[in-house]
Curated annotation (Swiss-Prot):
Keyword check for Metal-binding: yes
Name of this chain's protein: Chitooligosaccharide deacetylase
Keyword set, alphabetical order: Cytoplasm, Hydrolase, Metal-binding, Nodulation
Residues annotated as binding a divalent metal cation: H73, H77
A GO term, aspect molecular function: metal ion binding
Species the sequence originates in: Azorhizobium caulinodans (strain ATCC 43989 / DSM 5975 / JCM 20966 / LMG 6465 / NBRC 14845 / NCIMB 13405 / ORS 571)
Length: 210
């Protein structure tokens, strides 16, 4: 399935599910996510904000060393639908240069638009840079800090072969004031500890995006 040209579900491998994390890297959350995944030999994809990757390059490198994929999530996380063409290109290309400097040329192959806000202009830039646009098919809205059991149920009730699950290991720069109010992704980490083995028990392999 795709929406405006971006992948929302992967159909090639029916035994896999793809957990993705937006808005990192974050110094307290991203390493904790990696530790949970490592404990279960699970892999994921991290859509990282360029300015945070520049600030915490060692975390991005560790994600890469652990076998995870890293995707482009712009440099500052603006809503690109509201921006002129030059700003759209700057946000995507600047993040790409930053991430390639950390991870190596050719490693970052996917792009996700902030807020899932796509346009033909955005897709044109993404295609020009050579990235694959990616959306999601399961969104438990963990950024709203729901109850842990609700977060778990939303993921497990909607997970299907090829599902792309959206979670967050950070927050956009302009939403930092809400970080502590919303629990600093504590609910996401708690849910992840349950969801990862539960999905594996159903026979799914948790893989990075192809």
């Amino acid at each position: 399935m795709s929406v405006l040209g971006q992948a929302a579900r992967i159909t090639q491998n029916q035994s896999s599910i793809y957990i993705t994390f937006d808005d990192g890297p974050h110094p307290s959350v991203t390493p904790a996510v990696c530790e949970i995944l490592r404990e279960h030999s699970a892999l994921a994809t991290f859509f990282q904000i360029g300015r945070f990757a520049k600030e915490y390059p060692s975390i991005s490198r560790q994600c890469q060393l652990d076998g995870h994929a890293i995707g482009n999530h712009t440099f500052d996380h603006p809503n690109l639908q509201d921006r002129a063409g030059e700003e759209v290109e700057y946000q995507i290309s600047s993040a790409q240069k930053c991430l390639e400097h950390i991870c190596g040329r050719g490693f970052v192959r996917h792009f996700r638009a902030p807020y899932g806000a796509w346009s033909t202009q955005i897709l044109n830039v993404v295609n020009k840079i050579g990235l694959r646009p990616v959306s999601w098919s399961v969104d438990p809205r963990d950024w709203e800090a729901p109850r842990i059991e609700n977060l778990i149920n939303e993921i497990l009730d909607n997970a299907r072969p090829g599902s792309i699950i959206l979670l967050h290991d950070g927050c956009p720069p302009d939403e930092a004031a809400m970080w502590d109010v919303r629990g600093g992704r504590a609910q996401t980490l708690a849910a992840l500890r349950y969801v990862v083995p539960a999905l594996q028990a159903r026979g799914f392999a948790l893989q990075p995006l192809p």
